[in-house]
A protein has these predicted regions:
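Short glycine-rich, flexible loops that bind phosphorylated cofactors or substrates
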Residues: 83
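Short alpha-helix capping/helix-loop boundary micro-motifs
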Residues: 57-63
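Short beta-strand/loop turn elements enriched in aromatics
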Residues: 30-46
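A generic structural signal for residues embedded in beta-strands
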Residues: 75-76
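Non-catalytic DNA-recognition/assembly elements of restriction-modification systems
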Residues: 1-18, 34
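Short coil/turn segments at secondary-structure boundaries
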Residues: 21-29, 49
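Basic, amphipathic alpha-helical recognition segments used for DNA target recognition
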Residues: 6-13, 41-50, 67-70, 86-90, ...
């Protein structure tokens, strides 16, 4: 069996998160799961199910965040940097993330989770 090397951009789409205005109270306490890097550091888990706050459809529509389908990788890119989780529910994130939506025909989410965690120092550089 021959293994093929890929660049991350060849096996995944990478999306930034975004934050709805916190001045607009009706952007929050909705039904859309929303993650912050602090949520990942507080949970200290391989899997992400729920953050400390949800956003509303209005909040979602008001910013450039993307809905990340379940079973992909959330990677914090701001303090704290280099935290990873596999989202077990559809969710969106704040701007402190690079969200990695994998081509599952080419790679496995669990493999990529551990691969990225192992290479976190190279990613941070």
């Amino acid at each position: 069996m021959e293994l093929k090397k890929y660049k991350l951009g060849e096996i995944a789409e990478i999306y930034n998160g975004s934050t709805p205005s916190t001045k607009e109270f009706d952007n929050y306490d909705g039904n859309i799961v929303w993650a912050t890097p602090k949520d990942l550091s507080d949970q200290n888990s391989k899997y992400f199910y729920q953050g400390s706050r949800n956003i509303t459809q209005k909040g979602f529509d008001s910013c450039s965040t993307q809905l990340i389908p379940a079973n992909n990788i959330l990677m914090s890119s701001r303090a704290p940097i280099g935290l990873f989780a596999i989202n077990k529910v559809d969710c969106c994130t704040n701007q402190g993330f690079k969200n990695i939506v994998l081509d599952k025909k080419i790679t496995d989410v669990d493999f990529m989770y551990y691969f990225l965690k192992y290479h976190v120092k190279e990613i941070e550089a």
